[in-house]
Amino acid sequence: VRWTLPSGGHATVRLVTAAPMLRFSFREYLQVDVESSVRHEFLDGMILAMAGGTPDHAALAMAVGASLDRQLAGKKCRVYSADLRVRVLTTGFAGYPDVSVVCNKLEVDTEDANTATNPAVVVEILSPSTEQYDRGVKLQQYQQIVSLCHVVLVAHDEPRIEVWSRSGEEWSVAIASRGEHATLDALG
């Protein structure tokens, strides 16, 4: 559709019909996720396919997980890979952090025994295709998890780690660059 504006210019708008958005239950999401060769996240009733990772992404996630595992040796915390699904009980969001840490007993979702609900730490390796989503929607979702103390965002293109830490109801961020250490105070 093309309009003539009062200024004499023109505006063109392309009209697109939109199909009604389908909303799924968590159980329906689980069925899709289990039966698919691609992992999915669950957000506001929508099932979102996740982008596949690169070898560098996988190696960085493994290095972060191994480092956490060494540092937590002897503590009542366990480090998990991206195979562990995490669910935010207050919003229903479910996803696969690149690395998760659960301290004390693993608590699982009432609808799925393979979904954790009580991580103390989640780590996301940022990538060009997911960085905006990870820093925005996903970070906000993770921050709703009552047990969560830290969200760690690891840059893919530079030596930079952001550690988001909870203090009461507030969250603050500390940034570690080349030669600096990222600290997860809540884990001791």
Q: Whereabouts are the PLM-identified features?
A:
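Gly/Pro/Ser/Thr-rich low-complexity, intrinsically disordered segments predominantly at protein N-termini
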Residues: 1-188
